[in-house]
């Protein structure tokens, strides 16, 4: 992989391209062929999982329809919350369940905005919380430039934290670059910065990471640091359309976050998520197929001499060599 390119070139002449898990098959695990997939263009920007939901999750959801005439969401919600707590070695009071991780992001922006503080975020990252914070909450979002390697600059971010800062948003692995941060540097940053403001670490692509050096920041919650972690059932579990996500943080932050939740979850989605998080076989398959698909794409890029960043996710950030304003309409033609 070539690396001798400038940050300006990457930002001005790059696009995110999915290296999706588009390979076929194992009995019971085949790419979905719904009408939307057949009639609509390939939606590369959503990083969807073509294999999910698993058969186990689908059976659980079909069964859940028998209780859909009742207000049974609370029982399912409690069960899912307890499961997530168990899987992550935290207590149920450390967990909040959201209508996808997007609700977690939005409610965190509300929480930050009500306090009247600033939000610090990298210039190249997942924009949901930044857009909601600036447009809906009128929050001042302070942007931190990327490093020369298109990485998140933790040192500069730490230097920009001041008395006005209420929250720092970091995505690890980052979207759209697919890269992870140095675990020791991230842990140090979280420990030091959380003494001054909440550190929000978006781990939406957590399950896809193959780098053995990677480390989730969930363990810091048990140590009492004001760190907020978000994750989603939309990627590895293939439940994007059912909107299930969760947050892990201190009981104080979780309690406040829950006070802004809309209560939009449904029993079918929750039952599907419960079954899927217990279905280790499908998770393993989903991750393996993603790795195979990503390797096919990177091998092709290497063969063609196309520059890209090493990805730990189900998408790849490449240098197209074409201005993004020309690249997008060109893609629409295909």
Which residue ranges define each predicted feature?
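N-terminal "arm"/small-domain region of PLP-dependent enzymes with the aminotransferase-like
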Residues: 14-70, 86
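Phosphate-binding glycine-rich loop
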Residues: 79-118, 136
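Short acidic capping loops at alpha-helix termini that bridge into adjacent secondary structure
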Residues: 91-95, 117-118, 164, 203, ...
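Conserved PLP-binding catalytic core of the aspartate aminotransferase-like
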Residues: 303-332
């Amino acid at each position: 992989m070539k690396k001798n390119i400038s940050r300006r070139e990457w930002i001005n002449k790059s696009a995110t391209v999915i290296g999706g898990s588009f390979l076929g098959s194992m009995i019971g695990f085949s790419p979905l062929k719904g009408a939307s997939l057949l009639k609509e263009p390939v939606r590369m920007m959503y990083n969807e999982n073509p294999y999910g939901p698993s058969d186990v999750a689908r059976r659980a959801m079909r069964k859940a329809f028998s209780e859909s005439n009742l207000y049974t969401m609370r029982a399912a919600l409690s069960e899912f919350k307890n499961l997530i707590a168990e899987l992550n070695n935290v207590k149920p009071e450390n967990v909040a369940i959201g209508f996808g991780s997007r609700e977690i992001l939005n409610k965190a922006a509300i929480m930050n905005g009500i306090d009247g503080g600033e939000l610090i975020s990298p210039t190249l990252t997942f924009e949901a919380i930044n857009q909601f914070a600036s447009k809906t909450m009128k929050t001042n979002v302070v942007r931190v430039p990327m490093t020369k390697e298109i990485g998140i600059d933790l040192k500069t971010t730490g230097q920009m934290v001041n008395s006005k800062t209420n929250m720092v948003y970091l995505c690890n692995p980052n979207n759209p670059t697919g890269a992870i941060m140095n675990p020791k540097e991230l842990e140090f940053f979280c420990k030091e910065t959380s003494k001054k403001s909440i550190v929000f670490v978006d781990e939406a692509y957590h399950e896809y990471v193959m780098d053995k050096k990677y480390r989730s920041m969930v363990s810091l919650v048990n140590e009492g640091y004001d760190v907020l972690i978000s994750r989603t059932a939309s990627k590895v579990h293939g439940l994007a359309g059912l909107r299930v996500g969760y947050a892990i943080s201190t009981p104080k932050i979780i309690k406040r976050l829950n006070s802004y939740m809309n209560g939009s979850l449904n029993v079918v989605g929750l039952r599907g998520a419960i079954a899927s998080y217990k279905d280790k076989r499908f998770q393993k398959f989903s991750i393996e197929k993603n790795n195979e698909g990503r390797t096919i794409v990177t091998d092709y890029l290497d063969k063609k001499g196309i520059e890209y960043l090493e990805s730990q996710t189900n998408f790849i950030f490449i240098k197209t060599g074409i201005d993004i304003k020309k690249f997008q309409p060109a893609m629409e033609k295909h």
